[in-house]
Amino acid sequence: MARISTSSNRPVPTSSALRRQRERDDGGRSTRAPGHNTGLYGNQPGDPPTIRSTNTTVKRRYRPGTKALREIRRYQRSSELLIRKLPFARLVKEVAENYIGADYGIRWQSNAVLALQEACEAFLVHLLEDTNLCAIHAKRVTIMQKDIQLARRIRGNI
């Protein structure tokens, strides 16, 4: 035979007692402040879910080094030049003008400037690879000026 529970000896709470209990649980405020949503999807636990507007974008937060590794992989896959062509061409022309003199008026073929740029970028990439190895050898991950100096000294072109 099933047992039927009888009413307990606790009194039934009145509406004023319920209101006092709700204020106590609510921290003293009976109505929620607008914009103070803390539940799932920005709502209080009893509220119906609302749809967030589509124009609010949350900025993605990556762990330290994740974006750097992604950039390294992207640049290792690609074969395009990393230095912009026109600033490099201006630099080459300025250095040649300072070295030879402005009165000669040297002209440059675009292929000659492009060949110089390819050689410069290959040199810099190789130097930075050696510099990174020097930093790793020193149990560091950050390259420093002394790593570049050591790499150039070991290579023999100071």
Swiss-Prot record:
Annotated stretches, region: H3-like: 54-157
Where is the sequence biased in composition, kind Polar residues? 1-18
The known PTMs are summarized as:
Ubiquitinated. Is degraded through ubiquitin-mediated proteolysis when not protected by its association to the kinetochore.
What InterPro entries does the database record attribute to this sequence? Answer: Histone-fold (IPR009072), Histone_H2A/H2B/H3 (IPR007125), Histone_H3/CENP-A (IPR000164)
GO cellular component, as recorded: chromosome, centromeric region; nucleosome; nucleus
Origin: domain of life? Eukaryota
Q: Which SUPFAM superfamilies does the UniProt record give?
A: Histone-fold (SSF47113)
Localization per Swiss-Prot or TrEMBL: Nucleus; Chromosome, Centromere
TM helices/strands, residue ranges: none
* Compositional bias annotation for Basic and acidic residues: 20-29
Q: Which family does it belong to?
A: Belongs to the histone H3 family.
- State how it assembles: Component of centromeric nucleosomes, where DNA is wrapped around a histone octamer core. The octamer contains two molecules each of H2A, H2B, CSE4/CENPA and H4 assembled in one CSE4-H4 heterotetramer and two H2A-H2B heterodimers. Interacts with the inner kinetochore.
Q: What exactly does this protein do?
A: Histone H3-like nucleosomal protein that is specifically found in centromeric nucleosomes. Replaces conventional H3 in the nucleosome core of centromeric chromatin that serves as an assembly site for the inner kinetochore. Required for recruitment and assembly of kinetochore proteins, mitotic progression and chromosome segregation. May serve as an epigenetic mark that propagates centromere identity through replication and cell division.
Q: What protein name applies here?
A: Histone H3-like centromeric protein CSE4
Per the UniProt record, the source organism is Millerozyma farinosa
Quote the gene name from the UniProt entry.
CSE4
